[in-house]
A protein has these predicted regions:
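N-terminal secretory/targeting leader peptides
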Residues: 1-31, 39-267
Length: 267
Protein backbone atom coordinates (compact mmCIF):
# COMPACT_ATOMS: atom_id res chain seq x y z
CA UNK A 1 0.00 0.00 0.00
CA UNK A 2 1.07 3.60 -0.57
CA UNK A 3 -1.24 5.89 1.47
CA UNK A 4 -0.73 9.19 3.23
CA UNK A 5 0.34 7.89 6.62
CA UNK A 6 -1.75 10.13 8.88
CA UNK A 7 -5.01 8.75 7.48
CA UNK A 8 -4.44 5.70 9.70
CA UNK A 9 -4.67 7.87 12.83
CA UNK A 10 -8.20 6.76 13.71
CA UNK A 11 -7.01 3.17 13.95
CA UNK A 12 -3.33 3.74 14.78
CA UNK A 13 -2.81 6.98 16.76
CA UNK A 14 0.95 6.72 16.32
CA UNK A 15 0.58 7.58 12.63
CA UNK A 16 -0.18 11.16 13.71
CA UNK A 17 3.52 11.18 14.65
CA UNK A 18 4.77 9.37 11.53
CA UNK A 19 4.07 12.43 9.40
CA UNK A 20 4.29 16.11 10.23
CA UNK A 21 1.85 17.83 12.55
CA UNK A 22 1.15 21.46 13.35
CA UNK A 23 4.26 23.37 14.47
CA UNK A 24 6.35 20.24 15.02
CA UNK A 25 9.28 19.10 12.88
CA UNK A 26 8.73 20.96 9.64
CA UNK A 27 11.47 20.06 7.16
CA UNK A 28 11.93 16.92 5.07
CA UNK A 29 15.53 16.50 6.27
CA UNK A 30 14.35 16.55 9.89
CA UNK A 31 11.93 13.71 9.22
CA UNK A 32 14.64 11.84 7.36
CA UNK A 33 16.90 12.27 10.39
CA UNK A 34 14.22 11.10 12.78
CA UNK A 35 13.30 8.01 10.77
CA UNK A 36 16.78 6.87 9.81
CA UNK A 37 19.00 8.12 12.64
CA UNK A 38 16.81 8.59 15.73
CA UNK A 39 14.79 5.37 15.81
CA UNK A 40 11.64 6.43 14.00
CA UNK A 41 11.77 3.62 11.46
CA UNK A 42 11.92 0.99 14.20
CA UNK A 43 8.91 2.52 15.96
CA UNK A 44 6.92 2.59 12.72
CA UNK A 45 7.78 -1.03 11.93
CA UNK A 46 6.79 -2.24 15.40
CA UNK A 47 3.46 -0.44 15.21
CA UNK A 48 2.58 -1.64 11.72
CA UNK A 49 3.68 -5.20 12.51
CA UNK A 50 0.79 -5.38 14.98
CA UNK A 51 -1.51 -4.68 12.01
CA UNK A 52 0.05 -7.51 9.99
CA UNK A 53 2.05 -5.12 7.81
CA UNK A 54 5.71 -4.46 7.17
CA UNK A 55 6.47 -0.74 7.05
CA UNK A 56 9.10 -0.45 4.33
CA UNK A 57 9.73 3.25 4.73
CA UNK A 58 8.39 6.80 4.47
CA UNK A 59 7.95 8.55 1.13
CA UNK A 60 8.58 12.29 1.03
CA UNK A 61 5.79 14.16 -0.74
CA UNK A 62 5.09 17.85 -0.13
CA UNK A 63 3.75 20.52 2.16
CA UNK A 64 -0.01 21.02 2.42
CA UNK A 65 -1.66 24.36 1.72
CA UNK A 66 -5.11 25.78 2.45
CA UNK A 67 -7.43 26.99 -0.30
CA UNK A 68 -10.12 29.41 0.85
CA UNK A 69 -13.11 31.17 -0.62
CA UNK A 70 -12.65 34.02 1.85
CA UNK A 71 -9.53 35.91 2.94
CA UNK A 72 -7.97 34.66 6.18
CA UNK A 73 -5.34 37.24 7.08
CA UNK A 74 -4.73 36.52 10.76
CA UNK A 75 -5.20 33.84 13.39
CA UNK A 76 -8.51 35.31 14.55
CA UNK A 77 -10.01 35.04 11.05
CA UNK A 78 -10.17 31.25 11.38
CA UNK A 79 -13.00 31.63 13.89
CA UNK A 80 -16.21 30.33 12.33
CA UNK A 81 -14.54 29.19 9.10
CA UNK A 82 -15.87 25.86 7.88
CA UNK A 83 -12.71 24.05 6.83
CA UNK A 84 -12.01 20.58 5.51
CA UNK A 85 -9.00 19.01 7.25
CA UNK A 86 -7.80 15.38 7.50
CA UNK A 87 -9.04 14.92 11.07
CA UNK A 88 -7.04 13.81 14.09
CA UNK A 89 -4.60 16.17 15.73
CA UNK A 90 -4.80 18.70 12.89
CA UNK A 91 -8.58 18.98 13.20
CA UNK A 92 -8.34 19.48 16.96
CA UNK A 93 -5.87 22.34 16.55
CA UNK A 94 -8.04 24.17 14.03
CA UNK A 95 -11.11 23.57 16.19
CA UNK A 96 -9.24 25.08 19.14
CA UNK A 97 -8.66 28.15 16.97
CA UNK A 98 -12.42 28.47 16.49
CA UNK A 99 -12.81 26.87 13.07
CA UNK A 100 -15.57 24.40 12.25
CA UNK A 101 -13.74 21.34 10.94
CA UNK A 102 -15.18 18.94 8.38
CA UNK A 103 -14.02 15.50 7.26
CA UNK A 104 -14.37 14.86 3.53
CA UNK A 105 -12.84 12.28 1.19
CA UNK A 106 -10.42 13.78 -1.30
CA UNK A 107 -12.82 13.41 -4.21
CA UNK A 108 -15.46 15.53 -2.47
CA UNK A 109 -13.29 18.53 -1.63
CA UNK A 110 -13.50 20.35 -4.97
CA UNK A 111 -17.30 20.10 -5.29
CA UNK A 112 -17.73 21.12 -1.64
CA UNK A 113 -15.70 24.28 -2.27
CA UNK A 114 -17.47 24.90 -5.56
CA UNK A 115 -20.92 24.73 -3.95
CA UNK A 116 -19.91 26.70 -0.86
CA UNK A 117 -20.55 23.75 1.46
CA UNK A 118 -17.19 24.59 3.02
CA UNK A 119 -15.28 27.87 3.17
CA UNK A 120 -11.78 26.44 2.99
CA UNK A 121 -9.90 23.19 2.59
CA UNK A 122 -6.54 21.74 3.41
CA UNK A 123 -5.29 19.64 0.54
CA UNK A 124 -1.88 18.71 -0.79
CA UNK A 125 0.61 21.03 -2.47
CA UNK A 126 0.41 23.74 -5.12
CA UNK A 127 1.04 21.66 -8.25
CA UNK A 128 -1.36 18.84 -7.46
CA UNK A 129 -4.05 21.26 -6.33
CA UNK A 130 -3.71 23.41 -9.44
CA UNK A 131 -4.11 20.36 -11.65
CA UNK A 132 -7.26 19.50 -9.70
CA UNK A 133 -8.67 22.97 -10.46
CA UNK A 134 -8.71 24.46 -6.96
CA UNK A 135 -7.84 27.88 -8.43
CA UNK A 136 -11.26 27.84 -10.09
CA UNK A 137 -13.24 27.57 -6.86
CA UNK A 138 -11.10 29.32 -4.21
CA UNK A 139 -9.35 32.62 -4.86
CA UNK A 140 -7.16 32.60 -1.74
CA UNK A 141 -4.29 30.37 -0.62
CA UNK A 142 -3.46 30.60 3.08
CA UNK A 143 0.11 29.93 4.17
CA UNK A 144 2.39 30.77 7.06
CA UNK A 145 5.35 33.16 6.83
CA UNK A 146 8.24 32.13 4.54
CA UNK A 147 10.07 30.31 7.34
CA UNK A 148 6.88 28.37 8.26
CA UNK A 149 5.07 28.02 4.92
CA UNK A 150 2.65 25.36 6.16
CA UNK A 151 1.58 25.77 9.76
CA UNK A 152 -0.40 22.54 9.97
CA UNK A 153 1.21 19.93 7.69
CA UNK A 154 4.60 21.02 6.36
CA UNK A 155 5.90 17.53 5.48
CA UNK A 156 3.02 15.34 4.34
CA UNK A 157 4.57 11.88 4.33
CA UNK A 158 3.33 8.82 2.52
CA UNK A 159 4.56 5.29 3.16
CA UNK A 160 5.02 1.90 1.55
CA UNK A 161 3.65 -1.06 3.51
CA UNK A 162 3.41 -4.73 2.55
CA UNK A 163 1.47 -7.68 3.95
CA UNK A 164 3.78 -9.19 6.55
CA UNK A 165 3.40 -12.77 5.32
CA UNK A 166 4.21 -11.70 1.77
CA UNK A 167 7.19 -9.75 3.03
CA UNK A 168 8.60 -12.64 5.02
CA UNK A 169 8.30 -14.89 1.98
CA UNK A 170 10.71 -12.70 0.01
CA UNK A 171 14.42 -13.59 -0.06
CA UNK A 172 16.55 -11.42 2.22
CA UNK A 173 18.45 -9.99 -0.73
CA UNK A 174 15.22 -8.88 -2.42
CA UNK A 175 13.97 -7.31 0.82
CA UNK A 176 17.16 -5.27 1.08
CA UNK A 177 16.93 -4.10 -2.52
CA UNK A 178 13.28 -3.15 -2.09
CA UNK A 179 13.99 -1.13 1.06
CA UNK A 180 16.81 0.70 -0.73
CA UNK A 181 14.59 1.38 -3.76
CA UNK A 182 11.82 2.89 -1.60
CA UNK A 183 14.34 5.14 0.14
CA UNK A 184 15.69 6.36 -3.19
CA UNK A 185 12.21 6.77 -4.70
CA UNK A 186 11.18 8.92 -1.74
CA UNK A 187 13.57 11.68 -2.76
CA UNK A 188 13.05 11.27 -6.51
CA UNK A 189 9.32 11.71 -5.92
CA UNK A 190 9.87 14.72 -3.65
CA UNK A 191 12.16 16.46 -6.14
CA UNK A 192 9.65 15.97 -8.94
CA UNK A 193 6.86 17.47 -6.85
CA UNK A 194 8.98 20.50 -5.93
CA UNK A 195 9.78 21.18 -9.59
CA UNK A 196 6.08 20.98 -10.42
CA UNK A 197 5.31 23.41 -7.58
CA UNK A 198 7.70 26.00 -9.01
CA UNK A 199 5.86 25.77 -12.30
CA UNK A 200 2.44 26.01 -10.63
CA UNK A 201 2.85 29.24 -8.65
CA UNK A 202 2.84 31.58 -11.69
CA UNK A 203 -0.31 29.86 -12.92
CA UNK A 204 -2.10 30.72 -9.68
CA UNK A 205 -1.09 34.36 -10.08
CA UNK A 206 -2.35 34.37 -13.66
CA UNK A 207 -5.65 32.93 -12.41
CA UNK A 208 -6.04 35.81 -9.93
CA UNK A 209 -5.42 33.75 -6.80
CA UNK A 210 -4.03 35.71 -3.84
CA UNK A 211 -1.49 34.02 -1.59
CA UNK A 212 -1.98 35.29 1.98
CA UNK A 213 0.88 34.88 4.45
CA UNK A 214 0.04 34.67 8.14
CA UNK A 215 2.43 36.43 10.51
CA UNK A 216 4.94 35.04 12.98
CA UNK A 217 2.61 36.20 15.75
CA UNK A 218 -0.17 34.09 14.21
CA UNK A 219 2.21 31.12 14.22
CA UNK A 220 2.95 31.69 17.92
CA UNK A 221 -0.79 31.69 18.67
CA UNK A 222 -1.23 28.39 16.85
CA UNK A 223 1.77 26.95 18.68
CA UNK A 224 0.24 27.75 22.08
CA UNK A 225 -2.83 25.74 21.03
CA UNK A 226 -0.87 22.94 19.40
CA UNK A 227 1.56 21.92 22.13
CA UNK A 228 -1.01 20.59 24.66
CA UNK A 229 -2.70 18.70 21.81
CA UNK A 230 0.62 17.06 20.92
CA UNK A 231 0.81 15.70 24.46
CA UNK A 232 -2.80 14.54 24.41
CA UNK A 233 -2.20 12.47 21.27
CA UNK A 234 1.12 11.18 22.56
CA UNK A 235 -0.70 9.54 25.46
CA UNK A 236 -3.06 7.53 23.24
CA UNK A 237 -0.86 4.44 23.03
CA UNK A 238 2.66 3.20 23.71
CA UNK A 239 3.94 3.82 20.21
CA UNK A 240 2.59 7.36 20.11
CA UNK A 241 4.34 8.07 23.39
CA UNK A 242 7.60 6.54 22.18
CA UNK A 243 7.53 8.40 18.86
CA UNK A 244 6.63 11.77 20.33
CA UNK A 245 9.12 11.49 23.21
CA UNK A 246 11.88 11.01 20.66
CA UNK A 247 10.64 13.87 18.47
CA UNK A 248 10.28 16.15 21.48
CA UNK A 249 13.92 15.65 22.43
CA UNK A 250 14.86 16.42 18.84
CA UNK A 251 12.75 19.60 18.84
CA UNK A 252 14.30 20.70 22.13
CA UNK A 253 17.76 20.10 20.71
CA UNK A 254 17.17 22.34 17.70
CA UNK A 255 15.35 25.06 19.64
CA UNK A 256 11.83 24.43 18.34
CA UNK A 257 10.33 24.29 21.83
CA UNK A 258 11.33 25.84 25.12
CA UNK A 259 10.96 24.72 28.72
CA UNK A 260 8.55 27.61 29.25
CA UNK A 261 6.26 26.33 26.48
CA UNK A 262 6.31 22.84 28.00
CA UNK A 263 5.63 23.97 31.55
CA UNK A 264 3.06 21.75 33.26
CA UNK A 265 3.03 19.17 30.46
CA UNK A 266 4.36 15.63 30.77
CA UNK A 267 4.14 12.24 29.09
Amino acid sequence: MNPFTLYWAGRMPVTAFLSSYALGLDRPDQWETWFYSLGGLDIARKAFAEQGLFYVGPVQHDLNIIHSKKPIRRFEDFKGVKIRVPGGMIAEIFAAAGASTVLLPGGEVYPALERGVIDAADFVGPAVNYNLGFHQVAKYIIMGPPETPSIHQPVDLMDITINMNRWRALPKSLQERFIAAVHEWSWVHYAGIQKANLEAWPKYRQAGVEVIRLSNEDVRKFRRLAIPIWFKWAKMDKYSREAFASQLEYMKGIGYVTDEELKGLSL
